C-alpha cells in the first residue's frame, strides 16, 4: 500500500479541495492516460485496486505509471467513543484529486486494450474519469 515513509507531522487538518489541477494534468510518461473529470479523495487501497485491474488486463505487455500519491492522513476516532479527548489516530492515507489530474498512464499497448484496462480501473475509482492520449506538438 502506498503511504509516505516519513512526515513532518503525523496528522493534518481537513482543508478544502477546490480548483483545477494545474500540475500533473498532461500525459507525460506514457502514450495513454486516465484523467479525473471530477474532484474527490482516492485512498491508497483504491489506487492499488486500480493498478491491479490495469496490470491484470494488459497481462505482460506495456508499462504502467501511477501519477498520484496518497500523502494526506485521514484520522478516525474508535466506535462508541465520546467526543473530545483529542484527534483520532491515522486510519488511512488519501490523494486529493482535482479535475484534470492524470491518475494512471500506460505505454506499449494498443489503444483498444488501454481503453479496456482504464475502464476497469475507472470502475474502482470514486471520481469520474476520461481516457486521454499524449498530445504531440
From Swiss-Prot:
- This protein's GO CC annotations: cytosolic large ribosomal subunit
What Pfam families does the entry give? Ribosomal_L16
- Alphabetically list the UniProt keywords: Ribonucleoprotein, Ribosomal protein, RNA-binding, rRNA-binding, tRNA-binding
Give the GO terms filed under biological process for this record.
translation
Q: Which InterPro entries match?
A: Ribosomal_uL16 (IPR047873), Ribosomal_uL16_bact-type (IPR000114), Ribosomal_uL16_CS (IPR020798), Ribosomal_uL16_dom (IPR016180), Ribosomal_uL16_sf (IPR036920)
**What highest taxon heads this organism's lineage?**
Bacteria
Any one GO MF term held by the record is:
rRNA binding
Q: What does this protein do?
A: Binds 23S rRNA and is also seen to make contacts with the A and possibly P site tRNAs.
Please report which protein family the annotation says this sequence is part of: Belongs to the universal ribosomal protein uL16 family.
Subunit field text: Part of the 50S ribosomal subunit.
Recorded hits in NCBIfam families, A to Z, give: rplP_bact
**Protein name (Swiss-Prot/TrEMBL):** Large ribosomal subunit protein uL16
Q: Which organism is it from?
A: Francisella tularensis subsp. tularensis (strain SCHU S4 / Schu 4)
User: What does UniProt list as this organism's lineage?
Assistant: Bacteria, Pseudomonadati, Pseudomonadota, Gammaproteobacteria, Thiotrichales
